[in-house]
A protein has these predicted regions:
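Surface-exposed, charged/polar loop-rich segments
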Residues: 43-56, 61-69, 76, 133-145, ...
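Active-site-facing alpha/beta catalytic cores
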Residues: 1, 5-13, 305-306, 310
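Well-ordered, non-membrane alpha-helical segments in soluble/globular domains
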Residues: 13-22, 50-66, 91-95, 126, ...
Length: 310
């Protein structure tokens, strides 16, 4: 099952699937159905909370358009975690998840749900998913809405990346001492596993707005820079009092309002109905007095701007 877990890939599901179908047919293979997994965590690590949500929504819409065009059923899998930054798949928030990602056939329940929320809540969540994911649904976006989401992805990403690049050394150092709950390759060493902050050229070339495209292209970083796995990254951010859900979100909302007014915000909330609940949850772990002990003054100003504007 192909796993798509970067924003440029999520925005290109249509071309990925159509090429796969056409080449499979040319090779004589019959395709009766397609399963594809949409990663929800790593797009957030790369581009921030809102871009990850909107990227998955565009991917779902494109996948179901492929189903319609080729007559081949598509059964998407949503790979998500329990914290809002990673998808907020919990018993308390499952209605928002299913409303935000209509048409998914499978939702992953990761180990954090079992260990942080307990067996009984995990069992109830599994039963709800078993019942409600059986409903066959489709999902579509108009070209206008899809283009709007693409612009929002660029807006929120530029603020998120510009801040994250300034704190990566601190976050990597903290993440390296986060106690692991399962065996994983380390971020560095002869056998390692790390996340590259993506080159933004693939995203930038999809953006029609010239100013936005240039702003994304200006966020250049040194080759070889590494970031921890998303689990360690989120743990590090929460540990120093700044849930990553806030990074870039407040400034992104403000620019969206400046450009599109109240209707622009209403459109965002319409398609991301859980955003208020996600930010409310993350806000319980916000501790700006603690953050100030770890991060430079410039970053603190950006974070405070995000918090105020949320």
């Amino acid at each position: 099952i192909p796993l798509i877990e970067e924003i440029p890939g999520l925005l290109s599901i249509d071309s990925i699937l159509s090429e796969y179908i056409e080449k499979s047919k040319a090779a004589g293979f019959e395709i009766k159905k397609i399963r594809i997994m949409l990663g929800r965590s790593d797009p957030a690590l790369s581009c921030g909370l809102v871009p990850a949500v909107l990227g998955c929504k565009i991917a779902l819409a494109q996948a179901f358009q492929i189903e319609k065009d080729f007559g081949i059923p598509v059964f998407p899998i949503l790979g998500a975690g329990s914290l809002p930054f990673r998808g907020h798949v919990t018993l308390e928030n499952i209605n928002n998840v299913l409303e935000t990602y209509p048409g998914v056939k499978t939702v992953t329940i990761q180990s954090a749900m079992r260990y942080d929320h307990g067996f009984e809540k995990t069992r109830k969540l599994a039963l709800i998913l078993k019942e409600r994911l059986g409903e066959r649904k489709s999902f579509s976006l108009t070209r206008e809405v899809s283009d709007y989401f693409l612009e929002l992805i660029a807006i929120f990403t530029k603020y998120y990346i510009s801040t994250v690049l300034k704190i990566q050394d601190v976050i990597c150092n903290i993440s390296d001492i986060i106690p692991p709950q399962r065996d994983r390759l380390t971020r560095s060493g002869s056998i390692s596993y790390a996340r590259n902050i993506p080159l933004l050229k693939d995203l930038a070339k999809l953006i029609e707005d010239h100013k936005l495209r240039e702003e994304l292209q200006s966020l250049i970083y040194k080759a070889g820079q590494k970031f921890p796995r998303v689990i360690s990254y989120v743990a590090a951010m929460y540990s120093i009092g700044i849930p990553p859900e806030f990074i870039g979100t407040g400034r992104g909302i403000y620019e969206t309002y400046e450009k599109y007014g109240g209707k622009g915000i209403e459109k965002l909330v319409e398609y991301y109905p859980g955003i208020k609940n996600d930010m409310r949850f993350a806000g319980r772990y916000l501790a700006l007095d603690v953050v100030e002990e770890f991060l430079p003054e410039e970053v603190i100003r950006e974070i405070k701007s995000d918090v105020e504007k949320v």
